[in-house]
Amino acid sequence: MIKELFAVGAHFGYSKSRSHPSMRSFIYGFKNQQAVIDLEQTVGQLERASAFIRGLAMEGKEILLVGNKIEAMNIVRQAAESLDVPYVASRWLGGTFTNWPQIKSRIDRMHELKDKRDKGELSVYTKKEQLLFSREISRLERYLLSLSNMTKLPAAVVVIDPMQEAIVVSEAGKVKVPVVALAGSDCNLAGVNYPVVANDSNVKSIQFFVDKMVEAYRAGQSDAREAKVTA
C-alpha cells in the first residue's frame, strides 16, 4: 500500500513552519522545508481506521462523512451517495451534533413540507403563503438535504482535514461520536480517535482515503449479510 500512497502524493505535508507539534512523530523528515510524512505509519493508521469502519457497518451502524474544503466536496458527496449515508460537503451547521434535537426537528419539518407539496396539500393556501412555504423548503434543503436520512447521531464521523473541520471535531467530542480523520501535517490531532496522517489537500490523496473508507464500509455490510445467511 505504501507504493499506492506514494503514487497519489500522500507523503507530502505542509511547510515546516506550519507543522503541528502533535504531528512530530508521524513526520519522516523535511525536504526543502516541506514535511515528508512517514507512510509506514499511515498504512497502519489506514488499516486501523478501516477495521473500525468495517465493524460499524457489520453492526448495521451509520456513519457521517464531512468534507467542506473544495478538494473534498465532490469526493465526499459521491462516496456518501454511493453508500446511502448522510454527509456534509458545503458548510457545517453549528449544533448539528450538540443541538441534535433541534436539527432533527428541522429535518422533520423539511420532510413534512416536501410531502405536503408533493401531495398537493399546499395548494389550499394563498399564493403568498405557498411562496413562503417554497422559500422555507429551499432554505431547509440548502443545509439539511444531505442529512435528510439521518435519524440519530451517527456511530462515527469521517472527516477530511480536522483543522478546517475543528468545530465538527469539537462537537463530536462533546457527544461522544468517534472521529476518523484524514489529517495533514498542520493538523492538531486532539479529539481525533482514528487519525490517518497523509496529504489532506490533494484530490488524489483524499480520493484514496475516502475510497478505503467506502471499501471498509461495504465490506462490513457484506460481512453482515453473510452472517445472516449462516445464522
Residue ranges of predicted features:
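Ribosome large-subunit tunnel/peptidyl-transferase-proximal elements
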Residues: 1-231
